Amino acid sequence: SALKYFLENHTTVKKQQCINNKTGKVIKACVPMHTFGRPCRIDEIKEICDKHYVFLIEDAAESVGSTYKGRHTGTFGQVGVMSFNGNKIITAGGGGCIVTNDKALAKKAKHLTTTAKVQHKWDFNHDMVGYNYRMPNLNASLLVAQLENLDNFISSKRKLANVYETFFNSNNYVFV
């Protein structure tokens, strides 16, 4: 894959950091995207990232509910992110979510998305720059209501992907 070629031919691993040979900068993360309900070959990407000490953040916005080798997309990397904008598989009109099995990352994400307020009975202190990224309950209810139709939504996205693939293949383009 292109990622493997780039990492193995254009980087050096030093002290558990992947360094771009041309710029000297540390490559900190890889963000592969699963599109049209069709997962990418995430196991191969994860293996490469693990080998090169690159943090793996999966963009699973276009593959909510999809699985790869029996496992949901967004769960292979250290973090999975999903958007619920109007053009996604399911929508809340905006917003998104972060999934992780790393308790420290989850705690920090929750802290940042709830204005980074330090818990105290009467004092209002913030220890970091935080924002209010909480989804309103009405938006969340719109999202949850769509879950019973999730399989149909995924099927529709995959049909669209097949149309694109047919077009690109018939015009000598590679659709990955």
Features from the language model and the residues they span:
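Conserved PLP phosphate-binding loop immediately N-terminal to the Schiff-base lysine helix
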Residues: 1-2, 13-44, 54-83, 89
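PLP-dependent aminotransferase class I/II
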Residues: 5-8, 13-25, 29-32, 42-44, ...
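Active-site PLP attachment segment
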Residues: 75-114, 137-140
